Amino acid sequence: HRLRQEIILGIGGVRALRAVGIHPQVFHTNEGHAGFLGLERIREWVDRGLSFVEAIEAVRAGSVFTTHTPVPAGIDQFPRQLFERYFTDYATQCGITIDQLVTLGQSNPDSDTLNMALMGLRLAARANGVARLHGEVSRQMFATLWPGFPIKEVPIGHVTNGVHARSWVSERVDEL
């Protein structure tokens, strides 16, 4: 199932970096596919003695989230029941209930779905879309995370995708 793939990317990714001695100060998630890395980092901070709330703040301070999908249908969402199957023990390790963990990805308290984009945005200090228009669409799409904010002040910026041709293209191809 897709959820297991994302667990491997997120949690496994952090553990793989740690295993080879790499300890980034900032993590950048592209869309929600590796979003569970935020939960692994929360668990690490809790293991070091922080409370769950303090761990969220520590993770947030070292996280950036890029959203690529400007339509709800393109965002990974998982049934709460499936999430609970894989993360109830994880919540216990963090000294919290599964309900507290689920809230990171819920659109509202009654939602039975975990939304990876919402979790990514809640666990990031900075967020952006991949073009100016996409930033505008994303601010509208995710405005409910910042109630009371005018749409233009929702803290989702933009970085336009692109490449620097001289450093991207090989010399052989450039000579063509």
Q: What positions do the PLM features span?
A:
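Catalytic cores of carbohydrate-active enzymes across secretory and cytosolic contexts
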Residues: 1-176
